């Protein structure tokens, strides 16, 4: 995986997509992190030299370039050429609300690990015979997991509309934490790789695991006979939006992607390059060989299918002050040039929703988000007319009434608490009901579940890679 790809070598006869005249605005700390002062001054980062427009390339060259970009992203993030065997197992099933079943599931991901998930689906008794259902993957924000309110609210909401919805624990959270807790931040630790490896290596491997987590959730949906392979979407929030934007760029099995609270893939030294989290800074820096990373990622998503980016103008988490509509318009123009304004993919170029005076939140459960998802997925137990008039639930009131946890920082009207989510009468789900594995099995499988177990395997993989690097010198 770490060797130069054949496709990248083929690009030598084009305008050399990887040689783009990049100039880093600020030098990072030795471990790859920006200093606090650099983060504060990051803005949108340094300008990038535009890549050759699609109009300057022959059709064969353009096809090769698209494939090469995808190969390079996978290579940098250690995403294997072939995903692992799914190993899907349903441990048990329960009904969190009438009309919805929830399967407690595990499936395999990268590095021999397992992902615990809750998969929501409509009760078969409500479905017409042989009907095909859309699939939806929810990718959580930083610190959250399948126990988070928006994960299980989304699961019930969209299952009631006729979708199969996968919610899962990111590495280090929920059942992938040694203490089975949420908001642990276990994967936030910066780990310096052995000498001879890039300082970003650990974060690249961590991000690759997160990519395969999401891609295998798609694989799980595709393995279900009732799921329509042409109607699969992935929705990601915050860190999950960062993951989803990259997943959508490399996984063409996905039809639609929705990013809420994110999408600001900017220039060298900008938001993600100066982010303090190894799951974002390191992988984004590793994509510098692409050149205009934001335009390339958005172009690849357009080649795959539709994409919606939802943000609030007052979102300080994602630094929307430096990423106003004009910034998104500019990156959209550059992405369109990379695919060709008249190409079939141009119709899929990302669109945006910007809420005035709103901060960080999961907007795919509000009316605009659900309307867009319905246009892509065609929920069989709902309709455009019903969605337009569906009553809503004010999340701030709902979490109090149902004793659902919401972090204090997000229990604000301009953040998650202020959401008016579609649907009424959905319950809170007790934490114990959202455990995928029986405790005895979780104890037995810890070496395939927890961040600590993954970290041990990854340290060994890095040592081996460093040894091979030394031998080649």
Outline where the language-model segments fall:
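Primarily recognizes the serine-hydrolase "nucleophile elbow" in alpha/beta-hydrolase
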Residues: 216-289
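Cap/lid segment of the alpha/beta-hydrolase catalytic domain
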Residues: 129-212, 269-270
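Boundary at the C-terminal end of the N-terminal hydrophobic targeting segment
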Residues: 23-25
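Bacterial N-terminal signal peptides that target proteins for export
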Residues: 2-12
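The feature captures the conserved acid-bearing segment of alpha/beta-hydrolase catalytic domains
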Residues: 266-336
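Proline/glycine-enriched tight loop/beta-turn segments at coil->beta junctions
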Residues: 112-115, 123-135
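Alpha/beta-hydrolase-fold serine-hydrolase catalytic core, especially in secreted/extracellular enzymes
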Residues: 27-103, 108-114, 305, 329-473
């Amino acid at each position: 995986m770490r060797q130069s790809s054949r496709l990248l070598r083929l690009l030598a006869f084009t305008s050399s997509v990887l040689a783009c005249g990049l100039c880093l605005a600020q030098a990072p700390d030795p471990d790859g992190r920006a200093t606090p002062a650099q983060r504060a001054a990051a803005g949108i980062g340094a300008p990038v030299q535009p890549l050759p427009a699609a109009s300057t390339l022959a059709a064969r060259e353009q096809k090769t370039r698209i494939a090469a970009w995808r190969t390079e992203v996978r290579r940098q993030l250690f995403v294997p050429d072939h995903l692992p065997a799914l190993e899907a197992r349903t441990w048990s099933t329960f009904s969190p609300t009438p009309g919805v079943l929830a399967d407690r599931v595990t499936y395999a991901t990268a590095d021999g690990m397992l992902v615990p998930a809750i998969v929501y689906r409509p009760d078969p008794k409500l479905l017409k015979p042989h009907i095909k259902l859309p699939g939806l993957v929810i990718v959580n924000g930083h610190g959250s997991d399948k126990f988070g309110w928006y994960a299980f609210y989304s699961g019930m909401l969209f299952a009631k509309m006729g979708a199969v919805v996968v919610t899962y624990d990111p590495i280090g959270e929920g059942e992938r934490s040694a203490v089975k807790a949420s908001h642990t931040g276990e994967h936030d630790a910066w780990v310096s790789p052995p000498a001879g490896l890039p300082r970003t290596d650990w974060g690249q491997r961590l991000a690759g695991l997160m990519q395969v987590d999401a891609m295998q959730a798609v694989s799980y949906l595709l393995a279900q006979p009732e799921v329509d392979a042409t109607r699969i979407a992935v929705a990601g929030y915050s860190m999950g939006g960062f993951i989803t934007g990259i997943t959508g760029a490399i996984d063409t099995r996905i039809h639609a992607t929705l990013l809420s609270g994110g999408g600001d893939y900017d220039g060298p030294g900008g938001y993600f390059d100066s982010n303090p989290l190894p799951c974002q800074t390191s992988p984004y820096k590793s994509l510098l060989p692409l050149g205009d990373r934001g335009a390339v990622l958005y172009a690849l998503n357009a080649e795959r299918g539709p994409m919606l980016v939802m943000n609030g103008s007052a979102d300080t988490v994602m630094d929307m002050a430096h990423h106003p509509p004009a910034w998104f318009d500019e990156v959209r123009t550059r992405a369109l040039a990379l695919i060709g304004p008249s190409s079939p993919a141009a119709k899929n170029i990302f669109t945006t929703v910007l809420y005035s005076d709103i901060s960080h939140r999961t907007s795919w459960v509000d009316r605009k988000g659900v309307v867009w998802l319905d246009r892509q997925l065609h929920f069989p137990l709902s309709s455009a007319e019903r969605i337009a008039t569906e009553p809503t639930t004010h999340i701030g009131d709902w979490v109090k009434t149902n004793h659902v946890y919401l972090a204090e920082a997000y229990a604000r009207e301009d953040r998650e608490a202020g959401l008016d989510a579609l649907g009424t009468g959905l319950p809170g789900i007790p934490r114990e009901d959202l455990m995928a594995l029986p405790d005895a099995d979780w104890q037995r499988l810890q070496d395939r579940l927890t961040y600590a177990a993954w970290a041990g395997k990854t340290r060994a993989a890095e040592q081996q890679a460093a040894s091979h690097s030394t031998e080649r010198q």
